[in-house]
């Protein structure tokens, strides 16, 4: 990792200024709060890998201005131009008060927290695609502007969050990607966006942990369903072992699984796999 204030750091693009780490610490680190440390580095391979390898307390936050080997679900790698987004990982330790089988809600919780924060702070509608994608609308089409990756690290979970903030069309890694800028966001200053994201994450995590991880009791399950663009859609679930399942996404159950109603009248829960939103033939797309 290279510290953000190290000699040779690349701050040549004035349209993409560096994060103000001291100001972020002053705003977010407080006695009795969740966040215990916040480090900003100029570049690293993966903030999730670095934070998982470090033996630190709950509430550690690691932010990178650039990642060279960021990972998504199924170990897919991705990258983005320096200072073009929010790339961070946080360490969460639910403790004995939350049964381990409920820890699977953490990436969904992070999605709710991130989507709600971006909708408020950036002024752009941000939706969720089950289980861990952040969607925005660009030129009338759904585009992925970010994602969540949660990994177990001892008695903790490291949750990685990536959001494309200022990427231009010619910088997108794939045609289905998007960014807050391309979605017409009213604010692209990453400092207030990061503050809003971490405050939202703290609020949701504190409520979830206080409810013993019960997603219904803390209204997380309700909030996820309300913000999930997958529900009510006909989707194709691409499952392990080259299997596929097509059906209408009708619910997210108490275990965080996506429930599909198939054409045979059965309801099938899906706990892992890629979800493809299928458009009706009449849409012309």
Place the predicted regions along the sequence by residue:
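N-terminal lobe of the biotin/lipoate ligase/transferase fold
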Residues: 1-120, 142, 285
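Long, positively charged amphipathic alpha-helical accessory segments at protein N-termini or as interdomain linkers
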Residues: 2-16, 95-126, 136-285
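Short loop/edge segments at beta-strand edges and connector loops
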Residues: 42, 128-130
């Amino acid at each position: 990792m290279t510290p953000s204030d190290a000699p040779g750091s690349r701050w040549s693009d004035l349209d993409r200024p560096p994060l103000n780490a001291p100001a972020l610490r002053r705003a977010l680190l407080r006695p009795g709060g969740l966040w215990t440390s916040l480090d900003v580095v100029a570049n690293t391979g993966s903030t999730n890998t670095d934070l998982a390898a470090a033996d630190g307390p709950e509430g550690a936050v690691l932010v990178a201005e650039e990642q060279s080997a960021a990972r998504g679900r199924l170990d897919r790698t991705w990258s983005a131009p320096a200072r073009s987004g929010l790339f961070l990982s946080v360490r969460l330790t639910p403790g004995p008060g939350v049964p381990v089988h409920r820890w699977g809600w953490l990436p969904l919780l992070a999605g709710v927290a991130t989507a709600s924060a971006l909708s408020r702070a950036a002024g752009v509608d941000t939706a969720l695609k089950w289980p861990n994608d952040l969607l925005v609308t660009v030129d009338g089409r759904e585009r992925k502007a970010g994602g969540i990756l949660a990994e177990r690290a001892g008695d903790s979970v490291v949750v990685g969050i990536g959001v494309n903030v200022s990427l231009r069309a010619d910088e997108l890694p794939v045609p289905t990607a998007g960014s807050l800028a391309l979605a017409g966001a009213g604010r692209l200053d990453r400092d207030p966006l990061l503050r809003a994201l971490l405050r939202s994450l703290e609020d949701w995590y504190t409520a979830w942990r206080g409810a013993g991880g019960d997603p219904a009791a803390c209204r997380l399950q309700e909030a996820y369903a309300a913000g999930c663009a997958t529900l009510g859609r006909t989707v194709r679930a691409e499952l392990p072992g080259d299997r596929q399942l097509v059906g209408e996404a009708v619910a997210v159950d108490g275990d965080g699984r996506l429930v599909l109603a198939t054409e045979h009248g059965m309801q099938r829960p899906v706990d892992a796999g890629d979800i493809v939103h299928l458009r009706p033939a009449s849409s012309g797309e």
